[in-house]
Each structure stands twice: as structure tokens, then as C-alpha cells.
Amino acid sequence: MKKVFITFAMIAMSTIAFAQSEEPATNGFGAKLTESNFHLGVDLQTKYIWRGMEMMTNDAAPVVFPAINYSNKGFYAYAMGGYAINGKYAEVDLGLSYTYKWLTIALNNYYYPTTNSPEDQYYNFKSRETGHWLEGVITIAPENIPAYLSVSNFFAGADKNLEGKQAYSTYAEIGGHYDFLNDHKIGLAVGAAFNKSCYNGYEHDFSICNIELKYTYSLKFKNDFTLPLSVAYITNPVYEKSHVNFIMNFAF
């Protein structure tokens, strides 16, 4: 009888210990630990080209883009910086977007801090003084077709024409890609400005300002980490310039 009791006690203790080990882990607030919807990223570009525009024309240098983003059920928010390695360029971007099936609607805020002064005017939102560029974007991307159409407009902020009035710079881009094995792909994008805008020096009513051909090669590591490496040929017919750009994307 004593042996039976001891055996029963040992089984009960092991059952309790197993049950305790199966209890979900919690954080310091007592909440159950779950997968995070936050992600980090760092991009590197040897030449900062955006929508065909050369963002650094003087003292050009490679630019690093640290970013944090949150995504959940179609909702996406991000904060991203852009910093030239020679300290001659800085950028701070914030954005929100929502995607439903093939449609994405986004709102972006671009800001370019001073790089030669400890003071700035980030919280100055006066129309004629602010350094913020506020943009709305609509993107259509069919679920079964590797292509997209995006239209953006700077509806407020520092986007002023030669007369000092709001320019409402409008840019449209159509693009697509062709996939190969191992996540390699080649993509083509063509972008155009539809009014006198920041993309053409506020001088042309319509202009094709961005043609980009890009090949992406993805390095895969043993821990399932993937490092996309891209080389893009970019030409801007407005300014008759062309560039070859190397891009490296880290995502965590």
C-alpha cells in the first residue's frame, strides 16, 4: 500500500510539473507572449535615386536607411530615416497605409532635417515655412499579376511652384517583375510627372522622369535569413541623366 501511495504521489507531482511547464510564457505585465508585429530594416544605396530624382547632387555619398514598421491585418505604419555616410544629407519619413485585396491607400510625411546646425524646425507646419512634404498615394496591385500602378500627389507642405504656390506635384508609376528560381527577379518601372512639379523642376506639364531596370539576387543563409542584393539602371529623360545603383536590403 505504501508503494502504491508513493507511486501515485510521484505521478501527481510529475503531472503538476508538466502542467506548469505547459503554461504560456508571459511578459512583465502578465500578458501572454505573442509574435511581434514590429519589424526592423536597414537599406543601403550607393546612390540615392528616388522616382528618377537624384536626391544628392553635391558631395554625393552612399545613404543608409534605418527603419521600423508595424503591420497587422492590412494596416501598415513605418518610420524611416535616410543618412548619407558623409553627413551631408538627412531625411525623416513617417507613413501610414491600409491594404485591402488589390488596393492600397497611403499617407506619407517626408522631412529633410538640417545637417549643419543643432537646431531645426520639425514642428513648424506653416504652409510657407514648413519643411514637411505631405503626400497621398493610391496603389493598385492585382493579386494574380506581378504588376502595379501607383499614383501619388503632394497635397500640402513644402511642394511650392516657381510662383510660391502649392504645386500639387503628381507622379504615376507603372511597373512589374519577372520571377526566377531562388527569389531572383528582374523588374521594370516607368514613372511620369503629370504637371509642373518637383520631378521636372516645375517647368513641364508632362514628363517621363523615371525609367528603372533592376535585377535582384537573393543570398540565402543557413538560418533562413535572406539578403536581397539589387543593381538598378536608372535614367531620367527630363534631366538627361543615368545612374547605376547598388542596393542592399536587410530585414529583421
Where are these regions (language model features)?
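Detector for outer-membrane/organellar transmembrane beta-barrel domains
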Residues: 124-197
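Short loop/turn motifs that connect adjacent beta-strands in outer-membrane beta-barrel proteins
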Residues: 22-37, 141-146, 178-187, 218-229, ...
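Residue-level signature of outer-membrane beta-barrel architecture
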Residues: 46, 70-72, 98-100, 109, ...
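Cleavable N-terminal export/targeting peptides
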Residues: 1-37
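Outer-membrane beta-barrel "beta-signal"
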Residues: 22-23, 213, 219, 240-252
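Transmembrane beta-strand segments that form the barrel wall of outer-membrane beta-barrel proteins
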Residues: 42-48, 74-85, 105-113, 120, ...
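Residues that define the transmembrane beta-barrel architecture of outer-membrane proteins
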Residues: 34-36, 60-64, 71, 88-92, ...
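Surface-exposed strand-loop-strand hairpins of Gram-negative outer-membrane beta-barrel proteins
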Residues: 48-64
